[in-house]
Amino acid sequence: MADDNNTNGAASPTLSILAQYTKDLSFENPGAPRSLQARDKAPTININVNVNANPLSDTDFDVVLSLNAEAKDGDKTVFHTELAYGGVFRVAGFPQEHMLPVLFIECPRMLFPFARQIIADVTRNGGFPPLMIDPIDFTQMFAQRVAEEQARAKVEAVPN
């Protein structure tokens, strides 16, 4: 007996990238040229990550991965960079309960290597060593987002 993964003639799920683009890119080096001089210790780097998804049609979605990195030496900003990197994805054939994980885990996972390279290039071009952002656990980020939304819904559901 052969395995049949195509139940009831339904199309198998597909996820494809139709386009990728830089939506917004900013790099600030407010202390240049002093910030480029050798320093005793490496600056502290804080990185914030966000993912947004918006429908364009029944099957096409715009997913934007936002990376914000700031390097500080004490209270002085050494550099600050922001990137909004987007992709237009065609998502078809997935059960409804899998749509949010696909949009908020798989799509940003596909965008991340390109966004990481842009951040590395812009920091290098700004006169610093390239900032190589560690891989991001989008599954954990999505789980945290869902937990926060559920907690917020509970608080809003409690009568005053």
Swiss-Prot record:
Localization annotation: Cytoplasm
HAMAP family to which the protein is assigned, alphabetical: SecB (MF_00821)
Keyword Chaperone: yes
Keywords assigned: Chaperone, Cytoplasm, Protein transport, Translocation, Transport
GO function term, MF aspect, one: unfolded protein binding
Coiled-coil residue spans: none
Quaternary structure and interacting proteins, as annotated: Homotetramer, a dimer of dimers. One homotetramer interacts with 1 SecA dimer.
Record Pfam families: SecB
InterPro entries: SecB, SecB-like_sf
Intrachain disulfide bonds: none
Functional description taken from the UniProt entry: One of the proteins required for the normal export of preproteins out of the cell cytoplasm. It is a molecular chaperone that binds to a subset of precursor proteins, maintaining them in a translocation-competent state. It also specifically binds to its receptor SecA.
Gene coding for it: secB
Membrane-spanning residues: none
Domain of life: Bacteria
GO terms (BP aspect): protein folding; protein tetramerization; protein transport
Protein family: Belongs to the SecB family.
Presence of keyword Transport: yes
Protein name: Protein-export protein SecB
GO cellular component annotations of the record: cytoplasm
